[in-house]
Amino acid sequence: MYALLLRVMFLVPPERIHHLAFAAMRVAARFAPTRALVRRLAVVDDPILHSTVFGVPFRAPLGLAAGFDKNAEGVDVWGPFGWGFAEIGTVTAQAQPGNPAPRLFRLPADRALINRMGFNNHGAARAAEQLRARTATVPIGANIGKTKVVEPAGAAADYATSAALLGPLADFVVVNVSSPNTPGLRDLQAVESLRPLLRTVLETVADGGRRVPVLVKIAPDLSDEDIDAVADLAVELGLAGIVATNTTIRRDGLHTDPEDVAAMGAGGLSGAPVADRSLEVLRRLYRRVGDRLALISVGGIETPEQAYQRVLAGASLLQGYTGFIYGGPFWTRKIHRGLAELLRRDGYTSLTEAVGAEHRGPRPQADTA
């Protein structure tokens, strides 16, 4: 059924259908009868999936990745639609229009998207207003980025402005230095640039008077050495975790016609083609930091089996966006139900018990004698 609907929706320009679908979801979540129906169809409340990560309780591990709800307009939508949490943004200190359209493209043959949105959003002050009014029952993270017109020398102060506005209202803050669509942003992933930026954000959030976990989001295109350096820095500074990974600028291995891909132009590629590298980065990070940091894995997750693989590889939480687009409004139910079944199949009593299990070797078999 959804496959047919998806074909119809794909007749509409991607950004337009995004706004229409998002509006429909907000309407469904606004009224008690439709909200109750959606919740019954989407929510999986299974104790085996409950966990506490960086001091925040999560009733389910799959969250909505940043990029869908840029302005925190749907914070009360995501719980009823089965998400364990959601990340708003990316939000910048100043409102900005983003890059010129067209800036969002579909690659159905690859179950992927290319975007060069450019952090289009209404600004941190507007997002803060939305967060103040929320009644959300799931954790909400605030993903913050650099305002495009701000020079690199002013990046730390720019991030601090967003952190000061959103930190007191969010359950966690994610520092995004990995989008390929803001010129020079990825240069901030270099440790010598990242250290003062993260310190400033940490100090700003601490000044807000409540403990708010701070994470950093990294790109899949970093070298292994740079991944290690960021991981070491995160531990050094006392970050709560790392979100891995953002979109990639690579285009190799795609099934979509190369001429069509070239015509789409620059931007970050998300979806199935990112899965292998995202898993690779996750494994490297866990080997580096173990349980000293929480790892949120995002990139190419489509099935319960892939979700389970990420947990075993070291992910305490998961995120999706492109999988949601191709999987439909109740995709979260499929992932959560399947993940719970896989955990029980292998003898785990909780999600937390399974995090990073592949790095600890085979599980001992129960004595049946």
UniProtKB/Swiss-Prot annotation:
It catalyses: (S)-dihydroorotate + a quinone = orotate + a quinol. Its EC number is 1.3.5.2. The keyword Cell membrane applies. One of its GO terms (biological process) is 'de novo' UMP biosynthetic process. Binds 1 FMN per subunit. It is an enzyme of class 1 (oxidoreductase). Substrate binds at residues 70, 115-119, 176, 181, 246-247. It is found in: Cell membrane. CDD domains: DHOD_2_like. GO terms for cellular component: cytoplasm; plasma membrane. SUPFAM superfamilies: FMN-linked oxidoreductases. The active site is at 179 (nucleophile). Keywords: Cell membrane, Flavoprotein, FMN, Membrane, Oxidoreductase, Pyrimidine biosynthesis. It is a peripheral membrane protein. Pathway: Pyrimidine metabolism; UMP biosynthesis via de novo pathway; orotate from (S)-dihydroorotate (quinone route): step 1/1. One of its GO terms (molecular function) is dihydroorotate dehydrogenase (quinone) activity. The keyword Oxidoreductase applies. InterPro entries: Aldolase_TIM, DHO_dehydrogenase, Dihydroorotate_DH_2, Dihydroorotate_DH_cat, Dihydroorotate_DH_CS. Its cofactor is FMN. Belongs to the dihydroorotate dehydrogenase family. Type 2 subfamily. Catalyzes the conversion of dihydroorotate to orotate with quinone as electron acceptor. Monomer. This is Dihydroorotate dehydrogenase (quinone). It comes from Nocardia farcinica (strain IFM 10152).
